[in-house]
C-alpha cells in the first residue's frame, strides 16, 4: 500500500481553506454552503452541500508557489487520475467540480462542467524518492482560474482588503 504524505500542516491549511470557501460560497448564493469531506475512495476532497443536497464537488489544493510561478511552468499540474475522477463525477452526476488552489495566500478557482482543458505531460515531484510521484499529468492553463476575494494570512482565512 502506498504511504500518505499528508502532514498536519497540510490538513490545517486545507481546513482553513475549506472554511473560507464555505463563507465565500454562503455569501455568494445567500444560502449556507457546507463542504463535507468525502472518503478517499471517491477521489475528490469534498461534496458541496446546501440544505442537505449535494450541489457540486470540490478539490482543494494548497501550494507554496505563486500564480506567476505556476503559470511559468505551463499551468497547474494535476495528476491524470485526479482529472479522471473529476470527469467521472461530472459525467455520473451532472454536477460541477470546483478546483480551489491556494497560492501564497491567494485563492484561485476553476469550475468544471465538462472535461477540463489540459495539456498531457509526464511529470510530478522528485523530492520524496517515491517513483509513484511521477506519471501522466494534466497541465491546466492558469487562464482557466479566477482569483477569489479570499486572502490567507498565517494559515487563517480573512476577508480580502
How does the language model describe each region?
Residues 5, 9, 20-23, 52, ...:
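Non-catalytic C-terminal interaction segments of nucleic acid-processing enzymes
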Residues 63-85:
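Mg2+/Mn2+-dependent nuclease catalytic core
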Residues 57-59, 97-102:
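A structural signal for short, well-ordered beta-strand segments and their strand-loop junctions
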Residues 83, 87-100, 109-112:
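Acidic, metal/cofactor-coordinating or nucleic-acid-engaging core segments within structured domains
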Residues 1-38:
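Acidic-basic catalytic patches of nuclease active cores, encompassing PD-(D/E)XK
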Residues 42:
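Beta-rich catalytic cores
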Residues 37-39, 99-106:
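Acidic carboxylate-rich catalytic motifs and surrounding loops in phosphoryl-/glycosyl-chemistry enzymes
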Residues 46-48, 52-68:
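Conserved catalytic cores of phosphodiester-cleaving nucleases, focusing on short active-site segments
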Amino acid at each position: 500500500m502506498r504511504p500518505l504524505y499528508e502532514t498536519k500542516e497540510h490538513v490545517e491549511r486545507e481546513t482553513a481553506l475549506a472554511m473560507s470557501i464555505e463563507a465565500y460560497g454562503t455569501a455568494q448564493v445567500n444560502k449556507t454552503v457546507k463542504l463535507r469531506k468525502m472518503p478517499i475512495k471517491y477521489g475528490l476532497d469534498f461534496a458541496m452541500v446546501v440544505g442537505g443536497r449535494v450541489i457540486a464537488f470540490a478539490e482543494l489544493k494548497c501550494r507554496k508557489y505563486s500564480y506567476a510561478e505556476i503559470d511559468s511552468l505551463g499551468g497547474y499540474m494535476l495528476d491524470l487520475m485526479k482529472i479522471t475522477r473529476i470527469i467521472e463525477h461530472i459525467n455520473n452526476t451532472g454536477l460541477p467540480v470546483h478546483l480551489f488552489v491556494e497560492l501564497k495566500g491567494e485563492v484561485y478557482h476553476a469550475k468544471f462542467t465538462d472535461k477540463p482543458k489540459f495539456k498531457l505531460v509526464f511529470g510530478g515531484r522528485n523530492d520524496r524518492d517515491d517513483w509513484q510521484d511521477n506519471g501522466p499529468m494534466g497541465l491546466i492553463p492558469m487562464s482557466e482560474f479566477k482569483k477569489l476575494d479570499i486572502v490567507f494570512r498565517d494559515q487563517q482565512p480573512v476577508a480580502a482588503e
